[in-house]
Design a protein with these regions (language model features):
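Membrane transport/envelope proteins' first extracytoplasmic loop
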Residues: 1-225, 234, 253-254, 267, ...
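Conserved G/P- and acidic residue-centered "switch" motifs that form tight phosphate/ATP-binding loops
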Residues: 96, 250, 275
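Short alpha-helical segment immediately N-terminal to, or the first helix within
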Residues: 98, 245-246
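Amphipathic cytosolic juxtamembrane alpha-helices at the membrane-cytosol interface
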Residues: 247, 251-266
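Short hydrophobic/aromatic, small-residue-rich stretches within specific transmembrane helices
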Residues: 227-230, 260
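Small-residue-rich transmembrane alpha-helices
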Residues: 229-241, 265-281
Length: 281
């Protein structure tokens, strides 16, 4: 997950304008106090026919928020589409199927994962993502333009020239960027990367699961140790007479300790070895 930020050049944030910015406006935005590089990342939200859902269409992104192809290939014709893998699984869609998006019937050529939509949040204010009724997809530039501007969102992604050291610095830098953009054009949405659930939910969820599993494993180890201690204590108490006889026969304390601990220690070692082999393979 962490490697994906560099591998797919994930954005430092995105913003949406009321109208498309011209080249002069983009240059002014990039040359603020915080130097940034701005990329067009326009999208369309369209209803689908075969399944009750909304799908967000993007052009192929080659410079920012790059795409991971999970199956098949990206669309090359103007009647083709590549859709998010999770959205496809939830709606029982596969490569080769047809999907009507808006007023156009398209062939699914690939299943993809968009690096800025690792969790399918359609809106940053949503409490939970919905991978059943919302998905993202890639279409050709020509097909994207054919849909017109009726549902077009003028969304832009930016990347800092100098990467912030932590979230606190990222917040300060984002506030400066937002104020600067507001002085140039009309902002309708502004989402820094550090607060974007669509990017960070998956990583945060994995981190939470890892913490929970670690605590659970420590508890299991304590419980197992307690069970072994009780079992060994009861065994020694039951065999006190036998132990006394063995001691009188010349057996040392060390030999008796090794005798009674051998079985549980063998069980622990075998379990640890098998568990590690299964866990790492």
């Amino acid at each position: 997950y962490d490697e994906s930020f560099e591998k797919y050049n994930i954005e430092s944030g995105n913003f949406e304008l009321l109208q498309k910015a011209d080249d002069d406006a983009i240059k002014k935005i990039e040359d603020g106090e915080e130097k940034i590089k701005v990329y067009e990342n326009f999208y369309l939200d369209k209803e689908t026919k075969e399944v009750d859902s909304t799908i967000r269409l993007f052009k192929n992104r080659k410079d920012i928020d790059r795409i991971c192809i999970m199956d098949g290939e990206l669309p090359s014709a103007d009647d083709e589409i590549a859709i998010d893998r999770m959205y496809a699984d939830n709606n029982k869609l596969k490569v080769g199927d047809s999907l009507t998006v808006g007023d156009k019937k398209l062939k699914i050529t690939g299943l993809v994962a968009l690096s800025d939509y690792s969790a399918l949040y359609s809106n940053p204010s949503d409490m939970m993502f919905d991978a059943l009724k919302f998905g993202v997809a890639i279409v050709t530039d020509t097909l994207f333009d054919d849909y017109g501007e009726a549902d077009l969102h003028y969304s832009y992604s930016w990347k800092y020239d100098k990467t912030p050291a932590d979230d606190e610095e990222a917040q300060d830098m984002a506030e400066k960027v937002m104020k600067h953009i507001n002085g140039i054009s009309m902002l309708t949405q502004f989402i820094p990367e550090y607060s974007n659930q669509a990017i960070h939910f998956t990583g945060d969820d994995i981190e939470g699961d890892n913490t929970m599993i670690t605590v659970f494993l420590y508890l299991v180890m304590v419980i197992i140790a307690f069970v072994f201690a009780i079992t060994t204590g009861n065994t020694i108490a039951k065999e006190a007479n036998v132990i006394g006889t063995l001691r009188a026969s010349g057996y040392t304390k060390g030999e008796l300790v090794r005798h009674y601990l051998a079985t549980p220690m063998i069980v622990v070692l075998v379990s640890a070895i098998v568990g590690n082999i299964l866990g790492y393979t």
